[in-house]
A protein has these predicted regions:
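RNase H-like nuclease fold core
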Residues: 1-62, 66, 159, 180
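A short hydrophobic/aromatic micro-motif that marks alpha-helical segments and, especially, helix-coil
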Residues: 19, 34, 94, 195-197
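Short, surface-exposed beta-strand-loop junctions and turns on beta-sheet-rich folds
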Residues: 22, 72-74, 194
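Glycine-rich loops and low-complexity Gly/Arg-rich segments
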Residues: 25-29, 39-43, 51-55, 80-83, ...
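Conserved beta-strand -> loop -> alpha-helix junction used to position metal-binding or nucleic-acid-contacting
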Residues: 55-101
Length: 213
């Protein structure tokens, strides 16, 4: 199962649960903002209908994993790469950033042991660099000089336990990305964009009709 949320404007979004095996959206609901409770309600609704969620692919939103803590959880590789890219940019200037970006490029082709070893070696090499501090002359307070690099590394370390779940349970055929749902979201937004002049009620009907097919 893949669970994700997309927004069409600040307060107009949809949470969707999709079965890659069935190639079908099994649950969707309009929401004003993304919350943990909406994921919980979605799971409850599906199980009430008789569906069994054997595993879930998520984008890494904090707290959502608790809703699915009793089943295998896969962190979407695409979203993990996006997180790192957001901190490092596409062209990191620091050598440490370039090397970390290179490690992330092995995410989809490696395994947990190999990836962990690469990450551990990188940290061992750059540990002192990551701990460098800068003093704010105006306030006298210090901050980590390479805060964005630290955040990129920390995201990988935090999500490591969920990045290779799909290899640990081959019998479940778990995708390693939310791409099948993201592709639907992209097409949906393009279609809704064509009908920009429609009011929210009509847009909602169009979106629900598309998601149900």
């Amino acid at each position: 199962m893949i669970g994700d949320v997309t927004f069409f404007n600040r307060w107009f979004g949809f949470i969707v649960f999709r079965s890659p095996a069935l190639k079908k959206n099994l649950y969707f609901k309009q929401i004003p903002y993304e919350t943990i409770s909406e994921y919980s309600l979605g799971r409850y609704a599906l199980e009430k209908q008789g569906f069994t969620i054997s595993a879930i692919v998520l984008d890494g939103r904090p707290g959502v994993r608790k809703v699915f803590s009793d089943i295998p959880i896969q962190m979407c590789h695409f979203h993990q790469k996006q997180i790192v890219r957001r901190y490092l940019t596409n062209k990191p200037k620091l050598e440490a950033g370039v090397e970390l970006k290179e490690i992330v490029s092995y995410l989809c082709t490696g395994n947990k042991e190999d990836f962990t070893q690469r990450l551990d070696k990188w940290y061992e090499k750059w540990e002192s660099f990551l701990k460098e501090r800068t003093i704010d002359k105006a306030t006298g307070h210090w901050f980590y000089t390479h805060g964005r690099l630290r955040s990129a590394y920390r995201s990988l370390r935090t999500n490591l336990s969920y990045l290779f779940t799909y290899l640990e349970y081959p019998e479940l055929n778990i995708p390693n990305t939310t791409n099948s749902l993201d592709g639907s979201f992209k097409n949906l937004k393009e279609l809704v964009g064509i009908h920009r002049g429609f009011n929210s009620t009509l847009k909602k009907k169009i979106i629900e009709e598309i998601l149900s097919n």
